[in-house]
């Protein structure tokens, strides 16, 4: 006998015989084929029952096709008890000796049948095909769900609605894409003790249908915890519904504290209101400082309240004594601190000086005195010399004023007790009650060192207690959408009691923490017999108690509406930080405490509330709540009028509809006030972009000035753009001096040097002729331009002379910027820009006879030092070149004649103010061709595109230079030294 794989037990001899006997009977194999492409297997001997093939569910439509004939399947005979019993093989001789079949045992529960024939008795081929058709229908209707955990209420509710469960198990995927009958029926779950046969068969059938759906996506996922693989499934299948939000910041103590700090922006009377004890994330230094300040002020309030309470209830002897350990100054200390706080709330401290400095040792002493008064029954020292009634009245009046400025006055008591909680833990783990500031800071500082976070929350010292026992309320609510926000509120809730009587002197967790995970560890103490032994009440029992004490209206007017408004307010404050993915919902559990005035105070919100049947109360309410969740999430999707169970709509956010687009063309209608910049023919933008690429912005002082100071006439839209660098000399060289197709190199070295004798006689011409002539010479250099102008003024005639532009070498200086390759004509804009030459006469006599003036003037020397010109020797050395350097150095120093007028260029359209920016441009020419002569040009004028040609036209028409002044290079240098800003190299002028 051949052995089976290790995953399946061996078959007995009887089973093998039954299998061989069934081979002679006609069989039919149910195989799955596509409806569009039916497949019929070829004629072959009928297969054995052990290798029947059942195709998986891979397409929406599946068709059943008989394997051999249309005859019905002939089922095997019913199995005997020996066949259904678990067989134990004999390993002594596996081939010759058959295995012995032990008798059935009553103590061992029956598991899944181990052979094909036995399995056919409870899952036949027809039943297998029926399960496959059911899975097929669920796949068509998108009714495939997966549940992680024991949520049988959700599972049963979905199964009743025709859903099919896909088990979340890790099985080996069949590579062939087809599964045999053995693959579907092997490794089925075992039968549990006490489980009926019907229940076990249903469980096995669900397992088989899940194997049909192995390759299908899930449409509904219920899980306790969202895992990483779920994000991948959501991205692949956006239509999948899941019961967990990716981000719900209010579910942690740290996140709830942070979110509710902005609640005042979402407050809406009657809809979003909340009572939340003040809480601080003490891992933050800012909030830690706020907590320390609030702790001290709370101690001051508690000190005065405790003193007044004892004084009115027990008399003055219970508070004051001659032998008291608490000094009388403690009352004055607390009184002054509260007065300062009220003044700050009323903004009365603005007009006063800073409050006196309170040292830390003063606070430490007062906090110790507060502990003596409250916990140790200490008395205040008083000798009886002062009357107590005025002091008591003033303290009572001050405490009444504090009720207005202390919103949580009803929450506080006399102990100044705070509760320290881990920021991201649940089930009451790590929670400590403390009333000592130093101990709290010790825990907090230790947590900072260990990278753990804590929150410190004010403990409710005056809660509503039932039969001297503390309790809280667990309230469920459901979020089905975040944008817009939809909140469902559950009508029923339950109360959780502590196992010990309430006492502020006992800080044990069994007294103050009502979590079931905490209270189940302790037995109930000596309490009132009317309290439940399971420490739980439903809301109906609590309402009956309120009816007995005459406060039933408080449930309908304060408690139930207050919890609903608090949840809505918390969700509105956290809406912006929640996950906005559609098809997502989650059930939350909120914990509330009730104060003595019957107002609910929100404590925390849990993302995975305990829904187990721990007590008789939760055994009834939790399954009902889960079924109602399915009604809201599943039924209401297809039927808006479906039953919702105990859920009611608490809040639905109304989002105003987006206005329809009507095809309107919106534009700004108006008139342009400022003119666009036009740099000499509309080529400035390209020029500036090229210049910006090759020159760094940080190295240009002009750019830094333009970035810091914007001219008033500059367009507003240009302020936000990076302004390009600008150089006045390069601009003049491009549009005035050099042909635009030539390179930027030295000009003076290429100019022809003509002697005065060779120059033709020039005749005086009117200014109009001079202007027209200058416009024709726009492409020439400024040296040639001024030389020709001088000749025309001296009587020469150039009417028959054809002036040609001098060809410039391709060489250029490294610092001269980009090579200019475009040629554009110079546009005459005479009306836009004018240059006046203002004469500033200098003291002294004119001496024009000598070509080398020898008159010295201190004022001229002062002007030279103020303008920071170069030394006279350097100017003389660079002016004449190497040929005539010795001849020029022999004469007296070059000093301007005292009577020689000084000329300066300025604008006439708008006078240049003191804030106008001027750029001293770099001179053109090499060092050997003469001195570097600066040119002062308004940057704003050049940036607006006002060319210099028109300026020179007006300048040359008004400039009256004598022949001796223009023919002498020393005279030109003297003009430079006297402050003239429009100069030419001396070597470029004709030698007289």
Swiss-Prot record:
What SUPFAM superfamilies does this protein's entry cite?
Glutathione synthetase ATP-binding domain-like
Annotated GO MF terms: ATP binding; protein-glycine ligase activity; protein-glycine ligase activity, elongating; protein-glycine ligase activity, initiating
- Renumbered to this chain, the Basic and acidic residues biased-composition regions fall at 7-26
Regions of biased composition (Polar residues) lie at 794-807
Q: InterPro entries this protein is in?
A: TTL/TTLL_fam (IPR004344), TTLL_monoglycylase (IPR051437)
Q: Compositional bias (Pro residues) at which positions?
A: 39-49
- Under what name is this protein listed? Tubulin glycylase 3A
